[in-house]
Amino acid sequence: MTDKIETLSHATKESIKIVISNFENFSMEKYGKVAIIPDLKEAKEEQVFDVLQAWINWNKLKSPTTVKLYFSHLRKYLHYMGVKLNDQDVKQELTFKHKIDEELYGLTVSDIQLILAEMRYKTKVQYLCQLSGLMRIGEVIQLRKKNLVLGKKNIIVKIPPTITKFSKGRTTFFSKEASRMLIPLLKEMDDNDVVFGSSDNPKFTDIKNKDNSISTTKQALRAAVKKADLEMTYESTGRYMINTHAFRAFGITKLSRHDPNFAKKLAGQKGYLLQYDRMTDEEKLNVYEKYESELTIDTTAKQKAEISQLKTDNDELQKLRDMIQDKDKVEKMFKQIKADELRLKELTSRAEAALTALKKANNL
C-alpha cells in the first residue's frame, strides 16, 4: 500500500491525508479516541458498517460526491490497515446521499459589476483574470509572474502542468481590461512571486499554501457578495449560488456560445478538437479577440472592445469586398484575353488564306 501511495500524485496523497484526518476527528468526537481501527479489526462486520455509516452521516454537510470520494480513499486505507470490505456488502449495508442536480445560477454582468465594486483592487483584478482566462481558482492563485507573457495588450498565460487539474499545461489569455489593471501590480513583483496567492510560505507544502490562498479569496468573495446583497443559496444543499467557480463558468458559457471547442481548450476541459493544439499563440489570440467583448465587464471597456471588434470585422469585410472586386477584374481580363485569342486566331486564319491565295496567283 505504501509503495502504491508513493506512485500517486502529490495532490492525491494530500487528499488521502485529509480523509484520514477527517476520520480521526470523527472517531475522537464519536468515541473519545483517535485510533479506533484496532477496534474495527476485532469487531463484527455489522459493527464495522455501523461505524462507517455513522461516519458518512457525520459528513452530511459535505456534498454527496465529496463523501463518496472520501469513502473511496478511506476504504483503501482501512484495507491497508487490515479492515477489508466486500464490494457487495458495501453496496448493501451503506447508504450515501444522492446528488440532487439543481439548476445552477448563472452570473450576469450586473452581478459581477456589483460584486467587484465591493472588492479591494487586487482581488477585483484576480476575479477579472479568472473570468476572462476561464481558469480554475486553484490555478489562478498559484500563478507566478514568470508564467505570464507580457508585451501585448492581452497578457498571454502559460499555465504550468503542476498546477492544473489534469496535469497538462495550457495557454490562455487575460482580457485587455484585466491585463490593463494587472500590469501595475506586476511591476512590483519578481518573476517567481505568486501573482494573486496570499500564501507562499516555503515552510508549507504547495497544497497547504494553495488551501490557505483559496480560503482567503473565498472569504473576500463572501464579504463582497454579502455587501452586494447577492447571498442566494440552493434549497437542496444550502450552498451559495455565487462562488469562485461561478466566475470561470461565466467565461466558459460566454465563449462556448461562439466556439465551444475553443472554450474547452482555454478552460482545460477534455473533449476539444485537436486543431487548437496546432495553432500558434498568435492564432489563438486572434480567435480570442473576436469574442473578447463577451468577457469584458466594465461598461466603458465593454463598449470599446465591441467597437474595436466591429472595426476589425468591417476591415475584414472590406478586404473580402476588395477580393471580390479584384476577382471580377481578373475574370474580365481573362475574358478579354480569350476574346483576343479568338480574334488573333481569326486574323491568323485570314492571313493564311490570303497567303495561300497569293501563292496560287503567282503560280498561274
Predicted feature residues:
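N-terminal core-binding DNA-recognition domain of tyrosine recombinases/integrases
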Residues: 1-103
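Flexible interdomain linker/hinge and immediately adjacent N-terminus
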Residues: 83-114, 163, 202-203, 207, ...
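C-terminal catalytic core of tyrosine-transesterase DNA break-rejoin enzymes
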Residues: 128, 246-269
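Basic, Lys/Arg- and aromatic-enriched nucleic-acid-binding interface segment
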Residues: 107-137
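Short, charged phosphate-coordinating catalytic segments
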Residues: 130-153, 261-262
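Conserved tyrosine-mediated DNA breakage-rejoining catalytic core shared by Y-recombinases
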Residues: 142-184
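Active-site/catalytic core of tyrosine-dependent DNA strand-transfer enzymes
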Residues: 175-238, 251, 259
